[in-house]
Amino acid sequence: MAKKSKIVKNEQRRELVQRYAERRAELKRTIRDPASSPERRAAAVSALQRLPRDSSPVRLRNRDVVDGRPRGHLRKFGLSRVRVREMAHRGELPGVRKASW
């Protein structure tokens, strides 16, 4: 079980990422646009750097939705490998069976 503070901090980051996503995408478009002037590009870089650090999607951590475990995360289920195994053994994941060949 992850610390509650880490789980809450990650959720706050998710909210920040959503709040600034459009602004961040607009600035990145300006920076990448070959038709934009060097002054406009420099202004966009400066504005992008002024945005909060936690508004960058790179800083998000995929966590288990049940207990917040940060490692061994399986995107397909949104769970950690440990939780997937437990739930699969109990038959709580539809369509998941033990491998047999």
UniProtKB/Swiss-Prot annotation:
- One term under GO cellular component: small ribosomal subunit
Domain of life from the UniProt record: Bacteria
Q: Which GO terms describe its molecular function?
A: rRNA binding; structural constituent of ribosome
Keyword Ribonucleoprotein assigned to the entry: answer is yes
Q: What Gene3D superfamilies does the record point to?
A: 1.10.287.1480
Extract the PANTHER family matched here.
30S RIBOSOMAL PROTEIN S14 (PTHR19836), SMALL RIBOSOMAL SUBUNIT PROTEIN US14A (PTHR19836:SF23)
The UniProt family comment states: Belongs to the universal ribosomal protein uS14 family.
Q: What protein does this entry describe?
A: Small ribosomal subunit protein uS14A
Q: Which gene encodes it?
A: rpsN
